[in-house]
Amino acid sequence: DEAVDTFYSCTLCQSFAPNHVCIITPERSGLCGAYNWLDGKAAFQINPTGPNQPVKKGPAIDAFKGQWKDINEFVCAHSHKSLEIFNLYSFIEFPMTSCGCFECISCVLPSTNGVMTVYRAYPGMTPSCMKFSTLAGTVGGGVQTPGFIGHSKLYIESRKFISAEGGARRIVWMNRELKEAMEPALRGI
């Protein structure tokens, strides 16, 4: 993320989450897992008026948490002014909103001071005493939900994954299928 001055937006999900704006960076793909930074860049070149727009970072307000002046202004304008402050790398303070098509949900488990991460195909109960569908109802819809975040599966591999709170090392629970799929990446963390 530090190597570029421009990120890309994605507003494809605004038909069902009107106030949600995805900001896609080289180290953070779209929540759905379908768009990465290069996809956003290519989509803009193909359709300059489409849902993927370049967003200059501008001056850093808090680079550690992933907050930049111009990103905040863009998100505010494109979220119908419902979101004024936005941190890319924190899910506790002013996290990115979620639409509803995210692959995974991560949330704080207060009893462990850790984080649990669950994949959308997992039908069982999580340690938060909620199933994925209940968590999705809490997180989705384009509202900031401190302590909860929707994200792509590959974002877990990123060094920017909830880095303001300690990153993937804070994960204390994952459903088995996700853990097995992510095992090679998690071993390197």
Give the location of each predicted region:
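Cysteine-centered metal-binding/redox modules
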Residues: 1-189
